[in-house]
Amino acid sequence: MLQRLSQWDYAISATCLGHRFNVQVARLARVISHSGDGYYYALFGGIIAFTPFAGAFWSLALPAFVIELMCYLLLKQIFRRDRPQALPVFIRPSDRFSFPSGHSAGAFVMAGSVAQIFPSWAGVAFTWASLVACSRVLLGVHFVSDIIAGASLGLLIVYGIN
């Protein structure tokens, strides 16, 4: 059964990759992926600091990000799943292993935190997080199961804290 899931995962990931050979799609996927880099969270946090909800947001988001980072690093070392090497890569990954997706986990921690504190922005936040996750597959650095695991990890942490 595990082998069948792995085959399904690879087939879906390869199909996704087949749709991003357009230069504009690859470029857009890179921009979306980079929007999930950690330093943008600090920038967003600086913006939130000027709202009356800054304390509530950071009391949820900061511990969630710390827990997410620790879990993400631990899981990468436990599973040590290589990135999809047979598939062309369109971005330089930050490390060798793919499971779980740290970008997906972080994006969903941010989206879940935004949704809890600013409910009217939940749709935008989760759409952005989903795009970050999908961009990682389109860029060839993750399998579909990596982003599902990362998104699940991020959400479990945020909603577990709250």
Task: Give a label for each model feature.
Residues 53, 80-85, 140-145:
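Transmembrane helix-loop junctions in multipass membrane proteins, especially transporters and channels
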Residues 36-45, 103-111:
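Core segments of transmembrane alpha-helices
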Residues 1-41, 72-94:
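N-terminal transmembrane-helix/juxtamembrane module of multi-pass inner/ER membrane proteins
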Residues 88-162:
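Membrane-embedded catalytic cores of phosphoryl/pyrophosphoryl-handling enzymes
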Residues 49, 71-80, 115, 158, ...:
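Membrane-water interface at transmembrane helix exits
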